[in-house]
Amino acid sequence: MKRETYEKYVKKALDMYEKAGIALTEKEKNSVEVVDWGLDNLDVLGLEIITYINTERVCAKEMVLLPGQTCAEHMHVPTNGQEGKEETFRCRYGKCYLYVTGEGNKDDIQGYIPPTDVTVFHEVVLNPGEQYTIMPETWHWFQAGPDRKSVV
């Protein structure tokens, strides 16, 4: 990713954190990750992250989804003899469409199908203040709601 692209997305993410009322230290502001998984399609498959802690068992992050961005489908697998991580999504700003293993049909979702393989369509809609926890080894993907921006 070009430095110019990285800096552009960091600025957008910091603006979103501010709109969401999330106070960040200077160290945190300088540690924003811009994630595109090497796909070079950040406007569609990507997100911006501030990581507060990330160990083998626990992780705490604030994630920004900008207009049009989707976090690709994945699961948290066992690592080093430990089961995969639980993950709790708490919507802080905007709306988040979370798709997890369970009943659901791709023709019935409120979001849009990203240009990558997705196989789970059980839809959980999160509004500010709402949260949902998934267990280890649960397939999931997520994207911002109708205004196409979200902080989770």
Describe the role of every protein-language-model region.
Residues M1-C59, P114-T116:
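A short, N-terminal "cap"/entry segment at the start of jelly-roll beta-barrel domains
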Residues I50-A60, C71-C91, T119:
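A short beta-loop-beta micro-motif enriched in histidine and acidic residues
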Residues L66-P67, G84-N105:
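Glycine- and acidic-residue-biased ligand/ion/polar-headgroup-sensing regions
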Residues T70-A72, P78-T79, F121, P128-W141:
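Histidine-centered metal-chelating micro-motifs
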Residues L98-N127:
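Double-stranded beta-helix
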Residues F142-P146:
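Asparagine-centered strand-capping/turn motif at beta-strand->loop junctions
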Residues V151-V152:
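Conserved small/polar residues in nucleotide/adenosyl-binding loops
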